[in-house]
């Protein structure tokens, strides 16, 4: 009986083919792990290089036309997008890695002992970036002593405010903490922790805000808590759009950890020691015995590690700087589709023309991928896509054809003012506002800032109210 010839598992290579096979294997592994697309022709092989793909130019104009196919490859098919170093708040200052300098003499008070030897100290004060500090006009602070002198306090008092004397790096009770804690019920579900600094710490944080953080510009797309910007400027770029995509960041302030705050101050040019002290002065660690009102561990969990406190004067500015890279990337992505992007605190908004509607199926996951890559999370239940036939609202302002407030809100406030004229000014204070008159005046001023015509009608009614009745 004749047996069939068995084929070898690996074919025999001719001379010169072994090198080509090896290089092909290397190229396959590179595509597998790095996501680099394989060139389809010799011309593409020759033109391919190591430069950044043109699709990710973050400086493209807002009005740039979208790609012809309205489609960008999914992020996993290309190299990771990286923001230029000067635009990205990083823990490294400059390109050279700075090593810890060990000395036997105490370089400054409260210097940390070396782990290897208790007779030596680590000097973290010799790596400040004078050029970066000068660029923003920031005060030069090289040691904790200089920081305390700038704050007008003794070094011991500043060290006490940083919480370095707390057991296990956190206060054991609310009385020992430097913050007042108050739980507020959210509009949808759950609770939010408000952490208001006590008098001395609030004064220190206010000086850090005025003397350092206010001198550092936020990204142009950030409109929340930025001078000369408001909810109106945040909504204006989206007027007349065919679609509006609204995303919400979950636990925006608690998701900014202590390490990220230190990295912000390092990127501004401060040495590691001063950046750590500034980071501890502007972050919070909740007491060990603090419980949530609903008794759920998940409610307290986001606040367990040291984080940005909602209620501190420095938190909005630091939150904007922590999201700087997020703003750069989302703004660049929107520009590639001919869309627009703005952010007001934790509210992200993208909008675009009708020709970019087919790309929505990729814009949404792409934007959420960027958010996750920047170590934030989105609230899926608050994600909205509003078309032209719907009422498109951005931070409470209707943007379908022009900037205005909703008709329902106008009618409600008009009815309250009319009843105040008929029955007296305090008769309609059903919510129990401490100063109902100022409350109504503030709502009317809000209307005047957005829609002056409707605001004037409300103002005329307000002036007819008899507040002595």
Located regions from the model:
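Intrinsically disordered, low-complexity polyampholyte segments enriched for Lys and acidic residues
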Residues: 14-18, 45
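Residues immediately flanking
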Residues: 247-249
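Short beta-strand
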Residues: 340-344
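Right-hand nucleic-acid polymerase module
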Residues: 22-184, 193, 197-215, 220-243, ...
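Short beta-strand->loop micro-motif that forms the acidic, two-metal-ion catalytic signature
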Residues: 346-353
């Amino acid at each position: 009986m004749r047996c069939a010839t068995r084929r070898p598992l690996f074919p025999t290579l001719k001379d010169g083919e072994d090198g080509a096979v090896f290089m092909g294997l290397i190229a396959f592994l590179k595509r597998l792990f790095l996501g680099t697309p394989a060139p389809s022709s010799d011309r593409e092989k020759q033109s391919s290089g190591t430069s950044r793909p043109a699709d990710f130019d973050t400086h493209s104009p807002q009005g740039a036309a979208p790609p012809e196919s309205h489609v960008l490859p999914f992020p996993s098919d290309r190299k990771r997008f990286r923001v230029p170093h000067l635009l990205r708040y990083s823990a490294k200052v400059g390109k050279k890695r700075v090593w810890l300098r060990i000395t036997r003499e105490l370089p400054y008070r409260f210097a940390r002992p070396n782990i290897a030897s208790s007779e030596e100290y680590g000097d973290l004060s010799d790596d400040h970036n004078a050029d970066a500090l000068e660029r923003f006009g920031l005060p030069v602070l090289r040691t904790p002593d200089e920081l305390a002198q700038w704050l007008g306090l003794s070094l011991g008092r500043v060290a006490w405010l940083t919480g370095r004397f707390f057991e296990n790096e956190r206060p054991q009770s609310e009385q020992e903490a430097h913050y007042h804690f108050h739980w507020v019920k959210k509009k949808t579900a759950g609770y939010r922790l408000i952490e208001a600094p006590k008098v001395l710490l609030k004064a220190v944080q206010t000086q850090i805000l005025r003397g350092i953080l206010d001198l550092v510009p936020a990204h142009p797309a950030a409109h929340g808590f930025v001078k000369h910007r408001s909810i109106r400027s945040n909504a204006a770029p989206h007027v007349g759009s065919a679609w509006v995509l609204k995303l919400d960041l979950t636990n925006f302030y608690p998701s900014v950890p202590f390490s990220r705050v230190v990295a912000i101050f390092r990127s501004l040019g401060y040495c590691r020691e001063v950046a750590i002290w500034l980071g501890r002065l502007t972050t919070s660690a909740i007491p060990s015995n603090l419980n949530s009102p609903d008794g759920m561990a998940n409610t307290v969990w986001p606040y367990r590690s040291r984080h940005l406190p909602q209620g501190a004067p420095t938190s909005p500015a630091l939150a904007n700087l922590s999201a700087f890279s997020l703003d750069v990337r989302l703004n660049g992505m929107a520009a590639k589709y001919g869309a627009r992007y703005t952010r007001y605190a934790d509210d992200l908004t993208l909008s675009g023309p009708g020709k970019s509607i087919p790309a929505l199926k990729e814009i949404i996951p792409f934007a959420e991928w960027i958010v996750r890559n920047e170590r934030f999370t989105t609230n899926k239940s608050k994600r909205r896509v509003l078309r032209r036939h719907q009422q498109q609202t951005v931070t409470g302002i209707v943007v379908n054809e022009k900037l205005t407030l909703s008709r329902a809100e106008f009618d409600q406030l008009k009815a309250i003012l009319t009843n105040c004229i008929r029955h007296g000014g305090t008769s309609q204070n059903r919510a129990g506002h401490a100063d109902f008159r100022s409350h109504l005046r503030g709502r009317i001023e809000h209307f005047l800032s957005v829609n002056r015509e409707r605001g004037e009608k409300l103002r005329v009614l307000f002036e007819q109210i008899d507040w002595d009745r």
